Amino acid sequence: MVFVWLTAFFLVVALIVLVIYQLMCLADLEFDYINPFDSSSRINKVVIPEFVLQAALSVLFLLSGHWAMFLLSAPMVYYNYTLYQRRQHLVDVTEIFNHLGREKKRRLFKIVGLIILLFLSLFWMIWTVLLEEDE
């Protein structure tokens, strides 16, 4: 059971790193350190891996029977799926300045949700280690 929590912890850390990378690219664009083409291509390269990691995390929670954690991570997967279906998951080079605020808010909300998942995963990992140590 510790393996599940350890895997979840590393998946959440990887997701946080990907979203922070996207936020850094948007901040660099906002302060004019990078051009729109480079910024959007860098962000678009990590969007699909982020979606796949988030789905893998939810499947891990589902298959391991951690329903509460699955229910906490499922809305983010659904949100990612809806973005993908509407073809709004990629950043458009020509519209990136118009949607800069919205894109930053979207990623900040993701960071908040992922940090909550990170702390919960860390808590349950420690709890599981302590329970297995008593047995």
Curated annotation (Swiss-Prot):
User: Where is this chain's protein located in or outside the cell?
Assistant: Endoplasmic reticulum membrane; Golgi apparatus membrane
Gene Ontology molecular function: cargo receptor activity; signaling receptor binding
Q: Which domain of life is it from?
A: Eukaryota
Keyword set, alphabetical order: Endoplasmic reticulum, Golgi apparatus, Membrane, Transmembrane, Transmembrane helix
Q: Return the protein name.
A: Protein cornichon homolog 1
Q: How does it sit in the membrane?
A: Multi-pass membrane protein
Primary subcellular site in the record, as a coarse category = endoplasmic reticulum
- How does the record describe its quaternary structure? Interacts with HKT1;3.
Q: Which family does it belong to?
A: Belongs to the cornichon family.
Q: Which Pfam families match?
A: Cornichon
Q: What does this protein do?
A: Acts as a cargo receptor necessary for the transportation of the cation transporter HKT1;3 and possibly other secretory proteins from the endoplasmic reticulum (ER) in COPII-coated vesicles targeted to the Golgi apparatus.
Q: Which organism is it from?
A: Oryza sativa subsp. japonica
Q: Which GO terms describe its cellular component?
A: endoplasmic reticulum membrane; Golgi membrane
